[in-house]
């Protein structure tokens, strides 16, 4: 049974709801749910709330019950497989079963190994018809593959061609990255002139881009679980790198790489709002105590040439539940991340200016051949005020998540 026109319409609605979880649901994925009767009467809808709060399915069920609706025999459209494990909240698949839902339409299998097909299997075992978008099961987990393989084709349902599975992955790049690769999706933001300069030779950079681009940059900060920079940027610019120019339900974690713990106690980085995490590789114990006294968490990780081990940083952030990592740093850290192959996506704002001499985006190399250059594909080019916003995705990252090609 393929996605009907109604399924497609309702799944688009569920995905639109899921977008409202941006900046809210981390570390949980962004999920939307719509529940309606067979004749098209909507009973309830919702999206995943803050961690520890209800998931999308629970919100939709509660809304339907609050309106006095009978749920038995209804269909639920969910953008990600209902969870099957006890975490901070009970399993969503059990809630759907208990409510008497007769049919569940899912855009994507959950990449979380604690779920990975188990939610779908439990729904089917309860006699619920389950329809999954065709590309959703590609390359997820062994549990998901086994759950699908063990079901007769007629019970599994079929696809709408993968459109909604892809949309769910796009919306949850960080969650899929953390579940599949054990590290966040790293997005490197850079504002530069047309000739690739991020500042004048003396470091002056305020402001290369216009107000609209700066506001848009804050929206990208908001969607991330953490914003990361390096000690060089703090010492040179004393930034805050919090979310101020757009509304936000919470401030992302601000992460600073400071191998020798040189952050001054007066740094605006340490000021509220929002939590602060500083990664060091040793340093003076008194400085560590001083930073902790300012409210920062200090985590010591293995050192590497030039600073903290970047792979260890990403692994630790993943363990803390960070899905998307937004980086705004200087040329040295930019280059280190690119050379290490850790940049999944470039968020580049280009201003219609030429600076001539100045600071580069990421001075690494020299490369032996052009084939050695990090490979990116343009996925989006859009005008933001007077500036251009360019999104470019690392080819290897896109291939890993099955997201090749333009959006």
Regions found by a protein language model. Give the residues of each.
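Zn2+-dependent cytidine deaminase-like catalytic core
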Residues: 35-143, 147-163, 281-284, 336-338
């Amino acid at each position: 049974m393929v996605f009907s026109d109604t399924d497609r319409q309702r799944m688009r609605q569920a995905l639109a709801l899921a977008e409202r979880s941006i900046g809210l649901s981390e570390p949980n994925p962004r999920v939307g749910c719509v529940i309606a009767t067979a004749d098209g009467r909507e009973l309830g809808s919702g999206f995943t709330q803050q961690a520890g709060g209800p998931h999308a399915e629970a919100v939709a069920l509660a809304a339907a019950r609050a309106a006095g609706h009978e749920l038995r025999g209804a269909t639920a459209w969910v953008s990600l497989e209902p969870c099957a494990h006890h975490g901070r909240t009970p399993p969503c698949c059990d809630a759907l079963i208990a409510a008497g839902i007769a049919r569940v339409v899912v855009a994507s299998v959950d990449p979380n190994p604690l779920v990975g097909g188990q939610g779908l299997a439990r729904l089917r075992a309860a006699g619920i018809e389950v329809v999954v978008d065709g590309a959703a099961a590609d390359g997820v987990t062994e549990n998901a593959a086994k759950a699908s393989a063990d079901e007769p084709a007629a019970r599994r349902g079929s696809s709408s061609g993968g459109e909604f599975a892809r949309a769910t992955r796009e919306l949850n790049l960080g969650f899929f990255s953390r579940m599949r690769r054990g590290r966040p999706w790293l997005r490197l933001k850079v504002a530069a002139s047309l000739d690739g300069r991020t500042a004048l030779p003396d470091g002056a950079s305020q402001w290369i881009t216009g107000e609209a681009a700066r506001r848009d940059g804050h929206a990208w900060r908001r969607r991330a679980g953490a914003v990361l920079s390096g000690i060089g940027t703090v010492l040179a610019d004393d930034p805050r790198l919090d979310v101020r120019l757009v509304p936000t339900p919470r401030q992302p974690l601000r992460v600073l790489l400071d191998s020798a713990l040189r952050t001054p106690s007066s740094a605006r980085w340490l000021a509220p709002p929002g939590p602060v995490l500083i990664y060091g590789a040793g340093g003076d114990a008194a400085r560590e105590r001083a930073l902790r006294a300012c409210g920062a968490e200090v985590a010591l990780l293995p050192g590497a040439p030039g600073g903290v081990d970047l792979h260890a940083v990403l692994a630790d952030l993943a363990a803390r539940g960070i899905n998307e990592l937004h980086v705004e740093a200087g040329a040295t850290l930019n280059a280190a991340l690119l050379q290490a192959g850790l940049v999944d996506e470039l968020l580049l704002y280009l201003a219609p200016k030429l600076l001539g001499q100045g600071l580069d985006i990421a001075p690494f190399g020299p490369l032996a051949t052009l084939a050695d250059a990090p490979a990116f594909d343009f996925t989006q080019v859009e005008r933001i005020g007077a500036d251009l916003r360019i999104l470019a995705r690392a080819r290897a990252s896109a291939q890993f998540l099955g997201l090749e090609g333009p959006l």
